Amino acid sequence: HGIQDSIGNRNAPALFNLAWHKEFMWDGAIHHIEAQALAPLHDSRELGSSIEALISKLQSSGFYQTEFFKVYGDSLINSKRVLQSLSAFELSLVSLQSKYDRVNQGKEVFTEQEKQGYLLFQNHCNRCHREPLFSNFEYLDNGLTVDPFLQDFGRFLITNVEKDKYKFKVPSLRNISYTYPYMHDGRFDKLRQVLVHYGNITVHSRGSD
């Protein structure tokens, strides 16, 4: 939910490991991480504000004036510094210390159940959710039925190429237990629902990738 409990078209993407992304948002509309921060700020259903209003609030805060002085050597607060600071924070959010990583480093081993799960993953999920970041960063059709209210055409809205209709950026599976709800529109609350969806993917009338 955004400002005044407004509901947008899409689920908020996770922020970790953005350093490895070349494009941002579900449809890849943004190509620079500093510009990404402006999207939710300007969206009337998210923050419904502007960079000017944000700067004004920060400038009126003695706390932020002090913090900017610590970083930049003076207390000037402008759009360039605000966006640099936000992107620096986002780039610091790195997920590379999971049990999976420790297993790859030879520090731990999977349980038998985890081994079976990993094998299933490699056979059925790894084509799109490629290791070690668990995304191939491509735009694919996930086979979901189209919400008649949202009518979200995905990547097509950016490229205007017919084959890009209903394609969305493949999300990373890292920290998956913490990033619910799932899918680009947040329609699934449980990971099991996602697995059932992909298990039944052939029943959908629209082809999927």
Predicted regions and their residues:
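Periplasmic c-type cytochrome electron-transfer domains
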Residues: 1-209
